[in-house]
From Swiss-Prot:
It comes from the Viruses. This is Protein P. It catalyses: DNA(n) + a 2'-deoxyribonucleoside 5'-triphosphate = DNA(n+1) + diphosphate; Endonucleolytic cleavage to 5'-phosphomonoester. Residues 178-346 are annotated as: Spacer. Its EC number is 2.7.7.7, 2.7.7.49, 3.1.26.4. One of its GO terms (molecular function) is RNA-directed DNA polymerase activity. Residues 219-269 are annotated as: Disordered. It comes from Hepatitis B virus genotype B2 subtype adw (isolate China/patient4/1996) (HBV-B). Activated by host HSP70 and HSP40 in vitro to be able to bind the epsilon loop of the pgRNA. Because deletion of the RNase H region renders the protein partly chaperone-independent, the chaperones may be needed indirectly to relieve occlusion of the RNA-binding site by this domain. Inhibited by several reverse-transcriptase inhibitors: Lamivudine, Adefovir and Entecavir. The record marks Y63 as: Priming of reverse-transcription by covalently linking the first nucleotide of the (-)DNA. Residues 223-235 have a biased composition (Low complexity).
Length: 843
């Protein structure tokens, strides 16, 4: 007969136990009993022949694709002109006095942030915008282009103008304009590994030299020596400044590069012009080899035509207009859905390209992207605005992956020790937190996004269109793109974007100027930045509390009036540093702080209500006696694991589920195991703050017996049969807690100290978790442990009781006070003393 739920609870000692704990508890360590219970609860039978269940409530397998939902009415969020002040360290010093070593180090990390991956894989421009919504290809293309354009205008992206230059908007930083003695300085990092062809690296070019530079001397390029007249011979054409570059000694025929420049052509100093010249010549040949549409030296879209050098058409006609969009103006409509109808709607479609306010030299940047982008809802609660998802996952994959730096995440107990108090709380919302942190321009070539232009994008995704023989953009196949769907989409989009349709239909390549969200380095940098700022705020207001995790910043003060004054002072300080706060999203929590999914009050910590509801829903939908896919089990364990510390048996109760996930086998819930878990999660107990105190209770064990020292009283006992030492130590800790009721126990066993009971026999782990809940352990060396003698059967010998003070830890959770000096032989996991214990003692 299967094990009933009531019997199982009694066995785990969760109800009033029958016999004394010293007899009952060691039985739970018995292997035979654990095996029988596992069989009764159907926990051990992992190989099942019935088909697996792949969906439980909202949980589907971890790798199943949820169908994304496109919203044609998405609004692009606005980005304020975010500019973090470069003298942030000096401003912090003015605010609080000299900074600590840790604060200094963290602020220097992000001024500017650097990113040097081992290997960067460049992808064709066609992969710039991911075809994530097959039904809404054109709408998604324009919405994404508009989002990228908005980011560029806000100074978050660089726009690649040529192989070695880029333009951007917003205020420049000093590392973007390193000028010495009037000429640009070469500052390529050795680690970057980019052998520069140009004797200058990042530095802003004078605005007048935005037009391509011309040079008449003979220079060597990758294509071999060029005759002087074959170089970029510039000529004014009706004042438009467009240039025709022709590379004669090329075995692949003639290349026509026709950008429409934005200003008159200027001659530059020979060193800089040769660099631009080489990049243009290289670029022309490079793009001819690899792609039918590339970028010229000034970053405009170029069309490449493959004509024999003596072609009559080539000589007789003027340059073909290079803009795909404007070519429709001169062509006959092919049908009622021809794009020429849209192009002829207005005379002035505006420029083919826009330039930023500042121009900067960059390391060599190919006309490629390194990651794709697409749009999703801003968050589950806000579906009116979109969010850009950038996929730079190439840096986290394969043998050349970058191992991202680790950083401290506060665990539940540390968070409770720190924040559980009778303070009033409010939380601040930093708008676009990631986009505050500037990146060094040398990182730009590794973080490229963009698009190949509307014509290629549509052509690539429509089956009837062909890009043959580099003929894309000539009249024969110009109309291949025309279709009813495209026509209707563009007509609707014209209402939204107007003449920007033309600008967005051109190819573009953009590199990140601020840290992007899709790179593993970004969370680390953001955590360092906000924790350093909070550390400064805490030292400026020692009677208050400021704490942050990523972009979530909370402030606490003893009264509401005090909190409002603190809020005003801190807000002004953050604004003076250039940090943008969203005042509409400031939340005042009263005495119960909602933070990181928890509710934290003076009574301790509990999970937030929406998580409790999710758990209830999960148990309602959980099928019994049906094998559930282990990927779905991962989702279930993720949810239950978050709330496990608030239950009686904690993580050990979930061990059967962990075992099935590890074995990649389906898991079948028996009615008893499901009832046990759902009862566990029905009553959640708060995790309380640990209190400092003096340890008066000690325990010790050997494989055959245990001993306790409770004040001046000594006790000992023996086990029926010898047990593994860790199991014996855990049992001794349980006996000490149940005999003395003390919440502070001295032990020398590291496994007991860690309070992780998942590696013990399953039943014992569950019972011990409940008995030792809320107990703190203090390390006592074996030689000084008063319980050492009783555990070995010697009751007559008395060692003096130690005065062992206990101070609860707040871990390394971004509290960077000066740590005491440590001997060099200690491991490098140093305990950072909290400044709170110096300046302000929690009530």
């Amino acid at each position: 007969m299967p094990l009933s739920y009531q019997h199982f609870r009694k066995m785990l000692l969760l109800d009033e136990e029958a016999g004394p704990l010293e007899e009952e508890l060691p039985r739970l360590a018995d292997e035979g009993l654990n095996r029988r219970v596992a069989e009764d609860l159907n926990l051990g039978d992992l190989n099942v022949s019935i088909p697996w269940t792949h969906k439980v409530g909202n949980f589907t397998g971890l790798y199943s694709s949820t169908v994304p939902c496109f919203n044609p009415q998405w609004q692009t969020p606005s980005f304020p002109s975010i500019h973090l002040q470069e003298d942030i360290v000096d401003r912090c010093k003015q605010f609080v006095g000299p900074l600590t070593v840790n604060e200094n180090r963290r602020l220097k990390l992000i001024m500017p942030a650097r990113f040097y991956p081992n290997v960067t894989k460049y992808l064709p421009l066609d992969k710039g915008i991911k075809p994530y919504y097959p039904e809404y290809i054109v709408d998604h293309y324009f919405q994404t282009r508009h989002y990228l354009h908005t980011l560029w205008k806000a100074g978050i992206l660089y726009k690649r103008e040529s192989t070695r230059s880029a333009s951007f908007c917003g205020s420049p930083y000093s590392w973007e304009q390193d000028l010495q003695h009037g000429r640009l300085v070469f500052q390529t990092s050795k680690r970057h590994g980019d052998k520069s062809f140009c004797p200058q690296s990042p530095g802003i070019l004078p605005r007048s030299s935005v037009g391509p530079c011309i040079q008449s001397q003979l220079r060597k390029s990758r294509l071999g020596p060029q005759p002087a007249q074959g170089q970029l011979a510039g000529r004014q054409q009706g004042g438009s400044g467009s240039i025709r570059a022709r590379v004669h000694p090329s075995p692949w025929g003639t290349v026509g590069v026709e950008p429409s420049g934005s200003g008159p052509t200027h001659n530059c100093a020979s060193s800089s012009s040769s660099c631009l010249h080489q990049s243009a010549v290289r670029k022309a040949a490079y793009s001819l080899l690899s792609t039918s549409k590339g970028h010229s030296s000034s970053g405009h879209a170029v069309e490449l035509h493959n004509f024999p050098p003596n072609s009559s058409r080539f000589q007789s006609q003027g340059p073909v207009p290079s803009c795909w969009w404007l070519q429709f103006r001169n062509s006959e409509p092919c049908s009622e859905y021809c794009l020429s109808h849209i192009v002829n709607l207005i005379e002035d479609w505006g420029p083919c390209t826009e330039h930023g306010e500042h121009r900067i030299r960059t390391p060599r940047t190919p006309a490629r992207v390194t990651g794709g982008v697409f749009l999703v809802d801003k968050n589950p609660h806000n579906t009116t605005e979109s969010r850009l998802v950038v996929d730079f996952s190439q840096f986290s994959r394969g043998n050349t992956r970058v191992s991202w730096p680790k950083f401290a995440v506060p665990n539940l107990q540390s968070l409770t020790n720190l924040l559980s108090s009778n303070l009033s709380w409010l939380s601040l919302d930093v708008s676009a937190a990631f986009y505050h942190l500037p990146l060094h321009p040398a990182a730009m070539p590794h973080l490229l996004v963009g698009s190949s232009g509307l014509s290629r994008y549509v052509a690539r995704l429509s089956s009837h269109s062909r890009i043959n023989n580099n003929q894309h953009g000539t009249m024969q196949n110009l109309h291949n793109s025309c279709s009813r769907n495209l026509y209707v989409s563009l007509m609707l989009l014209y209402k939204t974007y107007g003449r920007k349709l033309h600008l967005y239909s051109h190819p573009i390549i953009l590199g990140f100027r601020k840290i992007p969200m899709g790179v593993g380095l970004s969370p680390f940098l953001l955590a360092q930045f906000t924790s350093a700022i909070c550390s400064v705020v805490r030292r400026a207001f020692p009677h208050c509390l400021a704490f942050s995790y990523m972009d979530d910043v909370v402030l606490g003060a003893k009264s509401v009036q005090h909190l409002e004054a603190l809020y005003a002072a801190v807000t002004n300080f953050l604004l003076s540093l250039g940090i943008h706060l969203n005042p509409h999203k400031t939340k005042r929590w009263g005495y119960s702080l909602n933070f990181m999914g928890y509710v934290i009050g003076s009574w301790g910590t509990l999970p937030q209500e929406h998580i409790v509801q999710k758990i209830k829903m999960c148990f309602r939908k959980l099928p019994v006696n049906r094998p559930i896919d282990w990927k779905v089990c991962q989702r279930i364990v993720g949810l239950l694991g978050f709330a496990a510390p608030f239950t009686q048996c904690g993580y050990p109760a979930l061990m059967p589920l962990y075992a099935c996930i590890q074995a990649k086998q389906a898991f079948t819930f028996s009615p008893t195991y499901k009832a046990f878990l759902s009862k566990q999660y029905l009553n959640l107990y708060p995790v309380a703050r640990q209190r400092p105190g003096l340890c008066q209770v000690f325990r010790d064990a050997t494989p055959t017996g245990w001993g306790l020292a409770i004040g001046h009283q000594r006790m000992r006992g023996t086990f029926v049969s010898p047990l593994p030492i860790h199991t014996a130590e855990l049992l001794a800790a349980c006996f000490a807690r149940s005999r003395s009721g003390a919440k502070l126990i001295g032990t020398h066993n590291s496994v007991v100290l860690s309070r992780k009971y998942t590696s013990f026999p399953w039943l014992l782990g569950c019972a011990a978790n409940w008995i030792l809940r809320g107990t703190s352990f203090v390390y006592v060396p074996s030689a000084l442990n008063p319980a050492d003698d009783p555990s070995r059967g010697r009751l007559g010998l008395y060692r003096p009781l130690l005065r062992l003070p206990y101070q609860p830890t707040t871990g390394r959770t971004s509290l960077y006070a000066d740590s005491p000096s440590v001997p060099s032989h200690l491991p490098d996991r140093v305990h950072f003393a909290s400044p709170l214990h110096v300046a302000w003692r929690p009530p």
